[in-house]
Amino acid sequence: MDRAVSQVALENDEREAKNTWRLVFRIAILLLTVVTLAISAAALAYSMEASTPSDLIGIPTAISRAEEKITSALGSNQDVVDRIYKQVALESPLALLNTESTIMNAITSLSYQINGAANSSGCGAPIHDPDYIGGIGKELIVDDASDVTSFYPSAFQEHLNFIPAPTTGSGCTRIPSFDMSATHYCYTHNVILSGCRDHSHSHQYLALGVLRTSATGRVFFSTLHSINLDDTQNRKSCSVSATPLGCDMLCSKVTETEEEDYNSAVPTSMVHGRLGFDGQYHEKDLDVTTLFEDWVANYPGVGGGSFIDNRVWFPVYGGLKPNSPSDTAQEGKYVIYKRYNDTCPDEQDYQIRMAKSSYKPGRFGGKRVQQAILSIKVSTSLGEDPVLTVPPNTVTLMGAEGRVLTVGTSHFLYQRGSSYFSPALLYPMTVSNKTATLHSPYTFDAFTRPGSVPCQASARCPNSCVTGVYTDPYPLVFYRNHTLRGVFGTMLDDKQARLNPVSAVFDSISRSRITRVSSSSTKAAYTTSTCFKVVKTNKTYCLSIAEISNTLFGEFRIVPLLVEILKDDGVREARAGRLSQLREGWKDDIVSPIFCDAKNQTEYRRELESYAASWP
C-alpha cells in the first residue's frame, strides 16, 4: 500500500518538475522574442532616421507649407488658363461675330441695291478698309476696373480734311451732321453765301465716303460721292444717316425765321432725301399736314440719325399747337434733373413751377417746345411709312436739337442743353413696332455747355431758357454688362460765351486731361463726335467735327479734329470734381494753334463774347 502511494507521489513530483521547466522555457523564449523585437525596432529606427514623437509635431506645419506652394503654383497657372479661356471663349468668337456683322451689313446693303436695281438705285456698295472691320459702331473700350478719366485724347492729328471750307470772307458753312455705319460714312452741312444769319437761301453739301488707311498707317476719310444741292429749295437743320442704300437725309424747308415759324399755324415743310451709291440724289416731300398735324414748327435735330430694324431714325423737335391732342397729352408733365453734389436751393414747389414753365419759353410765343423721334422705312421709295414718336415730358426736357446713336446693341438719344440743364444728356432708347421709348438719361456733369444767365454752364435750378449749343457726346467706355461708363466729346469750356473748345473723356462727374484746340478766346459753336477703332493696330480714334471761327475765309470753318485715345496707367482712383478741376500734376495738352490766336485784350474779348453768344 505504502509502496503504491510512494510510486504515485514520485510520478507527481516528476510531472510538476516537467511543468516548471516548461514554464521557464516559455518565459525565456518570450523574453528573448521581446528583446529581439526591441533590438530590431531600434536598429530599424536608427537605420531609417525615423522621427521621434517630438519630431511629429512639425508635420502639420510642413503639410501647410506644401499646400501653400501647390496653391501658389496653381494660382500662377490660373492666369494662363484665364487668358486662354478669354481668348478662346470670348475674344475669338467676338472677333468672328464682328467680322460676320460687317459681312452681313455689306450683304444687306448689296441686297437692297439688287432689289432696287430696276428703279435705278445704283450698285457697287462701298466699304471701309479691312483694318476697320469690327471697329465701327461697337463698344470700343470695355473696362470694369480702370478709372474712365484715365483715358484721354492725344494732341490733334494731321489727316486729310474731307470737309469743304468757305472760299470768301462772307461765305459761311455751318450745322455739320455726321453718321458712320459698318460700311460707309455720311456727312452734310449748310452753305450760306452772304453771312451765317441769312435764312432766305442756302445750299446743302452732302457727301458719302469710307475710311481708308494710308501706306504709312494713317487714318483718312475718303469721299467717294458728293453733291451740292444748289437749287431754289432752302433746306435747313438737316440730319444725315448712313443706311444700306446710301446717305439718307431729313431736312426742313424754311422761308422764315424760327420765331416767325413758331407763330405760324401750319407745320414746317420737310423732305426725305438720299444720296445713292451711284452718286445720284433724290428726295421726296413728307406729308407734314398729317404727320405733324399737331405742330406749328418742326425741325430735324441736326445730329446724325441711325439705321435700326430696317428703318432710319431721326431726332426731331419743334412747337406744338396749343390745345392740340399732342399738347394736351403733355400738360402738367415735367422732369427735373439735378447737378452732381450741387443742389438747387429753391423751394420744391417753386422748382416744379419753373420746370413746367421751361417747356413754354417766351421766345417762341409760349408754344410748348417738344422732343420727338421720326422713323422712316428704308426702301427704294423715299418717305415710306413715316412714324412719329412723341416721348413724355416726364423723361425729356424741353425739345431741342439732338442725335440718335447706335453703339453695339444699345441705342441713345442725345438732347442739346437748350433748357436750364447744362450737362450733356444721353437717353437710352429702345425701339419696337416702329416707335421709340426713351428712358432716364445718363448725365455727364463736367461736360457742360455755355449759356445765358440764369442757364449758364454752372446753373443748377430749373428756369425757362432757350440757350446752349449743340455738342454731342459719343459713348466710349462700357462695363462688361454693356452699361455705359464714359463718353468722348468736344465741349465749349466757358460759362456763358461760345468760346474755348476742348476735347476730353468724361465720366458721370468729372473729365480727363484735355486737348485744347487753341487759346481760351477761340470762338466756336457746334461739335459732333464719333469714335472708331483700327482693329489691326487696336488703336481707338475719335473724330470731332467742330465749327471754329477766327479765320480769314468765312465766319465759321468746319474742321474735322482727329485724336487717338490714350491711357494713363498711373491713374487708378476715380475722382469727382467740377469741370474746372483737373488732377494734381496734370497739364492740358495744348497743341500749336491751328488758327490765328485772338488778342486777349479786354475790349476785344468783350466784343468776341457778345458776338459768340448771339448765334442760334
Curated annotation (Swiss-Prot):
Intravirion face residues: 1-26
InterPro entries: Hemagglutn-neuramid, Hemagglutn/HN, Sialidase_sf
Residue ranges of the region described as Involved in neuraminidase activity: 234-239
Virion surface side, ranges: 48-616
Catalytic activities: Hydrolysis of alpha-(2->3)-, alpha-(2->6)-, alpha-(2->8)- glycosidic linkages of terminal sialic acid residues in oligosaccharides, glycoproteins, glycolipids, colominic acid and synthetic substrates
Chief subcellular location: virion
Location of this chain's protein in the cell: Virion membrane; Host cell membrane
Disulfide pattern: C172-C196, C186-C247, C238-C251, C344-C461, C455-C465, C531-C542
Biological process terms in GO annotation: symbiont entry into host cell; virion attachment to host cell
TM spans (from-to): 27-47
Enzyme Commission no: 3.2.1.18
GO CC term (a single one): membrane
Gene3D superfamilies tied to this protein: 2.120.10.10
Membrane topology: Single-pass type II membrane protein
Record note on quaternary structure: Homotetramer; composed of disulfide-linked homodimers. Interacts with F protein trimer. Interacts with host CG-1B; this interaction inhibits viral adsorption and replication rather than internalization.
Family: Belongs to the paramyxoviruses hemagglutinin-neuraminidase family.
Annotated protein name in UniProt: Hemagglutinin-neuraminidase
Organism annotation: Newcastle disease virus (strain Chicken/Northern Ireland/Ulster/67) (NDV)
